[in-house]
UniProtKB/Swiss-Prot annotation:
Protein function: Catalyzes the reversible interconversion of serine and glycine with tetrahydrofolate (THF) serving as the one-carbon carrier. This reaction serves as the major source of one-carbon groups required for the biosynthesis of purines, thymidylate, methionine, and other important biomolecules. Also exhibits THF-independent aldolase activity toward beta-hydroxyamino acids, producing glycine and aldehydes, via a retro-aldol mechanism.
Domain of life: Bacteria
Signal sequence coordinates: none
Sequence similarity: Belongs to the SHMT family.
Primary subcellular site in the record, as a coarse category: cytoplasm
Assembly: Homodimer.
UniProt site (Plays an important role in substrate specificity): H225
Gene assigned in the entry: glyA
Name this protein carries in UniProt: Serine hydroxymethyltransferase
GO biological process, one term: glycine biosynthetic process from serine
Alphabetical list of NCBIfam families matching this protein: PRK00011.1
EC number: 2.1.2.1
């Protein structure tokens, strides 16, 4: 950085501190990842200067010929990746992508069926503290108490009972494959629209490692970070029949000018997602998750649903004498970043929780493989077994730093 240290040393120091934290801590938050240098360059470009309300060829400002090209490239790439009929790449976030879909098909007070946040859903799938729960009448499906997986017969019965106008599938903490075809059948049976929020699994879907929702859903929303390894932002895929309505819902419905520097970074990430290397990377994310899950279970931890099919796992800590909140804090003190997370039927409040959520995308980006995952699982076990012992946490922190040195975030090939 050439100018920032002199212009704003406080912000410069905060950024350098975050760089150090990312480089010398183990990032296991399932929704976080490290973008490529190319994505960073695009997002830090002069495109941040340009206002471009509207869409390519139909802007409300002049001088948009180059940002038009950027947005067209981003739209075409994401359509190609997922085989979609229409794409909108302007949503600033996954939440705004979801809001746009709701604005297209729902009126305030309409019935909607979504996944219970406490069972792995998302705030924007009807939580009462979120706009979705305030504007619409959400009913919730969850997981089976015994299998801790979605019971599609129960979803079907609930849908027939509440007759939702929209069914939402997708999750923020569900470690198993979601059967989008079954959800689509349920939606068709009750005459509902069907939307999938694939934010967490977008990279896996792009690589063909999780069934795609695109053939089955009227609308598919996603973030561009997480497994897709792009900048923080969102996008919407839909059938052509909804294209005009979706575009109007995003602009002028809920947003003004698009963030063209972020859309450029999205385009770069989409190009990266079209490579054979990206598919191998996604395969490794899953292999790493399975290796870590197996090692944690070998060490005596109970995982929700007994394992994982994707990039994340939920660890139930109820029999370990430690809450999710305490575990998150202890691990952070040892240089390992996870997040406290509710488990299904959790007796603890959401600010405390009985579990932690662990994901492997960021460590996989660093080049770590199965052996490192098993080692990290043992480090987690060492901390959680001695979570009040500062000497143990300091020892593990040094081991974490040594491991991180072997796998720098921005190697030459990144």
């Amino acid at each position: 950085m050439r100018y920032l240290p002199e212009v704003d040393p406080e912000i410069y120091e905060a950024i350098k501190s975050e760089e150090y934290r990312e480089e010398y801590h183990l990032e296991l938050i399932a929704s976080e990842n490290f973008v490529s240098r190319a994505v960073l360059e695009a997002q830090g470009s002069v495109l941040t200067n340009k206002y471009a309300e509207g869409y390519p060829g139909k802007r409300y400002y002049g001088g948009c010929m180059y940002v038009d090209k950027v947005e067209d490239i981003a739209r075409e790439r994401v359509k190609t990746i997922y085989g979609a009929e229409h794409a909108n790449v302007q949503p600033h976030s996954g939440s705004q992508a979801n809001m746009a879909v709701y604005f297209v098909v729902l009126n305030p007070g309409d019935n909607v069926l979504g996944m219970n946040l406490a069972h792995g859903g998302h705030l924007t799938h009807g939580s009462p503290v979120n706009f979705s729960g305030k504007l619409y009448n959400f009913y919730f499906y969850g997981v089976d108490r015994d299998t801790e997986m979605i019971n599609y017969d129960s979803v079907w019965n609930l849908a027939k009972e509440v007759k939702p106008k929209l069914i939402v599938a997708g999750a923020s903490a569900y470690p198993r494959i979601i059967d989008f075809e079954k959800f689509a059948q349920i939606a068709e049976d009750v005459g509902a629209y069907f939307m999938v929020d694939m934010a967490h699994i977008a990279g896996l879907v792009a690589a063909g490692l999780h069934p795609s929702p695109v053939p089955y859903a009227h609308f598919v929303t996603s973030t561009t970070h997480k497994t897709l390894r792009g900048p923080r932002g969102g996008f919407i895929l839909c059938k052509k029949e909804f294209a005009k309505e979706i575009d109007k819902a995003v602009f002028p419905g809920i947003q003004g000018g698009p963030l063209m520097h972020v859309i450029a970074a999205k385009a770069v990430a989409f190009k990266e997602a079209m490579t054979p290397e990206f598919k191998e990377y996604q395969k490794q994310i899953i292999l790493n998750a399975k290796a870590m899950a197996e090692e944690l279970m070998r060490l005596g931890y109970r995982l929700v649903s007994g394992g994982t099919d994707n990039h994340l796992m939920l660890v139930d800590l109820r029999d370990k004498g430690i809450t999710g909140k305490e575990a998150e804090k202890a691990l952070e003190e040892a240089g390992i970043t996870v997040n406290k997370n509710a488990i299904p039927f959790d007796p603890q409040p959401p600010t405390v929780t009985s579990g932690i959520r662990i994901g492997t995308p960021a460590l996989t980006t660093r080049g770590m493989k199965e052996d490192e995952m098993r080692y990290v699982a043992r480090l987690i076990h060492e901390v959680l077994s001695n979570f009040k012992d500062s000497k143990v946490k300091e020892k593990v922190k040094k081991e974490v730093e040594e491991l991180c040195k072997q796998f720098p975030i921005y190697r030459k090939e990144n």
